[in-house]
Amino acid sequence: MKTHRTDFCFCSRPAVARPSGFTLIELLVVIAIIGILAGMLLPALSRAKATAKSIASLSNLRQLAIGLQLYVDDHADRYPGHSSLASETTALGKPRTRWADYIYPYMQNEAVYLSPNLTRDERPRMSKAFAHTVADGPVETAQTRYFGGYGYNYQYLGNNRQPGGVAPFHARSSSLRAPAQTLSIGDTKGARLGNPANDYGHDGSGVYVLDPPLGSVMLGSQGSRRSSAEPGDGNAYYEGGSDGSDAHRSTPAARNNGRVNLVLVDGHAESLKVEALDGRSSGGSGQPHNALWNGVFDPAQR
């Protein structure tokens, strides 16, 4: 009897090929992780960008201080006025010469006169044309250059807003007994043209100056705009008003992580809270004073 051999093949079944790539669930997990990481990184990047702008702004202010000191050295130890006299305004309406124009020959880098922290909304109302870039009248051209965002401590350094026969005020550098504690130039947001409903810097109001928290009385120009020879007889702030009128004051701007960038008369730059600059406590309480503005670092003097 024949036997038949049957050949058996114990072969493994072919493996089912796994599709390449990620599954939908894996993709969703990866996307979620990326979203979490982005959410963690973006605020840090935003803070880093703000810090870089603040550092650039402090550098600008140091260079402006150099230009200002060179001007003072070249003008018998006297500071420039915040603006040219009203009597010097031309019939053609050419922009008046401002403090930035006065010191420009000594610091001819236009970029340092414009704050890197101005927002897109702020820039149109916070910028002033350099007078030397506007030829014969008020028409601005492609050659017109601008400065903006920085204000001058005009009530204690140089104020030409003196009507009624009162002489313009120009401080002597040697009269400032506390140069390391006297504001020279800093971030400003301008004034509100006397109307609380207006934006700061409305219609270019006070966008190139800074007012102290209290109007000057016995020191400096003895007021923003004096109406007589009596000390303090006149306005407290750039747009008029009396002490404490925020709508009239050309106010410091806390553009740098909640701080005001500024440079002092001795040339060093700092970032201060508005409250500290105005002599208030960190919570904003207490009576303001002009110690960091008046040249003598004395809170009792104005």
PLM feature spans:
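N-terminal leader/signal peptides at the extreme start of proteins
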Residues: 1-24
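Sequence-pattern detector for short linear motifs
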Residues: 8, 16, 50-52, 56, ...
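N-terminal cationic amphipathic segment used for targeting or macromolecule association
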Residues: 13-15, 30, 36, 42, ...
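Short, flexible active-site loop motifs that bind/organize anionic cofactors or intermediates
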Residues: 17, 35, 54, 102, ...
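Amphipathic alpha-helical segments typified by the pilin-like N-terminal helix
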Residues: 20-59
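Short, well-structured segments within or immediately adjacent to enzyme catalytic domains
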Residues: 57-58, 62-302
